[in-house]
Regions:
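Carbohydrate-active catalytic/glycan-binding domains of CAZyme proteins
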Residues: 1-251
Length: 251
């Protein structure tokens, strides 16, 4: 692999620790594909990690991970594990979509990829047509899948899909996509281009969102290469009527 190692996530599955990340080829740093590390020890900070290689696709799947693929996340529902990732399609100015598959093992898919969302709206098409950086939070019978859209400048923002926990999560019709972003630039607070979030909990078990954003509106050159992105935290509350997560800079 190359020096391009991106978007690691730590997950605990079936009694072992796993890191899901994306990496480039040593001969082509932009040949980004998803990989897996495994640790069988109780403490992942001092345990031994083993490379499991590139994430495996289902035997009958000819398409997953053939192109630029990254930002994988994993979640569990009703005893099944699911893998969600971003992958580019097309030629020339490619489109980045989100796909989902059920997992056979922590490092191989059981099912053929299913398209979850493409950049349909104008706010997902600024600079580049992008849906990437999926993250999942589960609450009150619903599964909320957030993602990031557009280029990584000040137009970068977060969208969201929602599904019922009892629905077929591999059926695109089970998911409802928000028409507008759920979190975007707030000039009054000096926060620009929020995105690529993850969910965790604080010491008391309250949900927390970790994300990155910029503190300056002016960007010199290509936003992808501009280092002014900072890690930030946000408390998650739930809408009293709908039960959906509320993303507010006040928290």
């Amino acid at each position: 692999m190359s020096e391009h190692i991106w978007a690691p996530e730590l997950h605990y599955l079936d009694g072992k620790w796993y890191i899901y990340f994306a990496g480039g080829d040593k001969d082509d740093v932009w040949a980004i594909r998803p990989y897996v590390l495994e640790c069988s020890d109780a403490d992942p900070l001092i345990g031994t990690w083993t490379e499991k290689g590139k994430m495996g696709r289902a035997d009958e799947d000819e398409f997953s991970f053939e192109a630029f693929s990254l930002d994988a996340t994993v979640f569990e529902n009703k005893g099944k594990h699911y893998y969600v990732w971003a992958e580019k399609v097309g030629v020339g100015k490619q489109i980045s979509n989100l796909y989902i598959g059920e997992m056979e093992t922590p490092y191989k898919l059981k099912t053929v990829q299913v398209l979850l969302t493409s950049p349909d709206y104008d706010w997902e098409r600024v600079g580049f047509w992008v849906n990437e950086g999926p993250a999942v939070i589960h609450h009150d019978g619903k599964i909320y899948l957030t993602y990031s859209a557009s280029e990584t400048g000040i137009a970068y923002c977060m969208g969201m899909l929602t599904a019922d926990e009892d629905s077929d999560l591999l059926d695109p019709k089970s998911w409802t996509k928000e028409r507008y972003p759920v979190l975007c630039t707030d000039e009054s607070r000096g926060i620009y281009g929020p995105g690529h979030n993850s969910f965790t909990v604080d010491e008391e078990g309250n949900p927390i969102m970790v994300y990155h954003a910029r503190t300056e509106a002016e960007i010199v050159g290509d936003p992808l290469y501009n280092p002014n992105r900072h890690a930030m935290l946000m408390k998650i509350h739930w809408d009293e009527k709908t039960g959906a997560p509320v993303f507010s800079y006040e928290d």
